[in-house]
Curated annotation (Swiss-Prot):
EC number per UniProt: 7.3.2.2
Protein name: Phosphonates import ATP-binding protein PhnC 2
Subcellular location, principal: membrane
Recorded superkingdom: Bacteria
Function: Part of the ABC transporter complex PhnCDE involved in phosphonates import. Responsible for energy coupling to the transport system.
Keywords, comma-separated and alphabetical: ATP-binding, Cell inner membrane, Cell membrane, Membrane, Nucleotide-binding, Phosphonate transport, Translocase, Transport
Ranges where the ABC transporter domain occurs: 5-253
Database matches in PANTHER family: AMINO ACID IMPORT ATP-BINDING PROTEIN, PHOSPHONATES IMPORT ATP-BINDING PROTEIN PHNC
Assembly: The complex is composed of two ATP-binding proteins (PhnC), two transmembrane proteins (PhnE) and a solute-binding protein (PhnD).
Reactions mediated catalytically: phosphonate(out) + ATP + H2O = phosphonate(in) + ADP + phosphate + H(+)
Binding locations of ATP: G37, A38, S39, G40, S41, G42, K43, S44
This protein's record includes keyword Cell membrane: yes
GO cellular component: plasma membrane
Amino acid sequence: MNDAIHVQGLNKTFSHKSALVDLALSIQPGEMVALIGASGSGKSTLLRHLAGLACCDRSNGGQVQVLGREVQSSGRLNSQVRRLRADIGYIFQQFNLVNRLSVLDNVLLGCLGRMPRWRGSLALFNREEKQRAMAALDRVGLADLATQRASTLSGGQQQRVAIARALTQRAEVILADEPIASLDPESARRVMEILADINRSDGKTVVVTLHQVDYAVRYCPRAVALKGGRIHFDGLAQDLSKQFLNDLYGADADASLMITERSRRVRQKPRLELAKV
C-alpha cells in the first residue's frame, strides 16, 4: 500500500534560520495524526509544504509526495500541483472564508479544483455540486444557515463551514492547521468530533496541528511531536508522558498543555451522528 503522505529529507530555511531539518515522515491512508509542538516548532510550515503552499529549500530541500504523487522536490513544485490540491483539503486556523458570500457559496468553492476554470470564474455550479454542498452543510449541522452571510457566523460555525468545503471538495487527505486554536471548548470539541468522524466513517487521511495535547490524545491515535523543525516523537498519542511534554514545551508546558487523566484513560469516541456526504 502506498503512503498517503511521504516526506523525505525535507529542509526549509527562513532568513538563515532552519524551520524544518532533514524531516522524514510517512502517514498511511486512513490515519488520523496530530502534529504537536510549541509555537515555531515547524508544525504549520510542514503542513503548508504537504499542500504545496510553500516550497522547500532548493539545496538539499527534500521531497514531498501525497497519494503517491510528487508535490515538490528540491525546491520545485510539481507543475501539476493545482490538480494535486484537488485531493488535498486544507482547513485554516482563521477559516479562510469569503465574508461577503453566503455560507453555501463558500462551501461551493470546494468544487473549483475539479471544474473548468471558465465555469469556476463565472460561479456556474451545477445541480449535483449544489446538492453535494448542501449535504456537506447538513453533515456539519449548518444546513439551516446556508443562505446566511459567512461574516455573521461564530468562529466555531465558520470552522464547520470550512470543513464542509473540504467535504464538498471530495479531498482524500485533509490537513487542518490549528483548527480549534481560537474556539471555545464546546466549539473545539464539536470541530474535533467532526474531523474524527470523517476519518473513521469515510476513511479519509486527516492530519491536524494542535497546541492542546489533551485533544490530540482524545481524538488522534498517532502523534508526531516537533521541536526546532525536527521530529522528537512519533508514536501512540496515549504514550506521551508529562516529562516528555515538559521537555517539548519548556516554559509553555502549563496546565492547558498537560494530558488530563480522562484523556489518558480512554480516547473519547465522537458523540455526533453525522451522515455521510
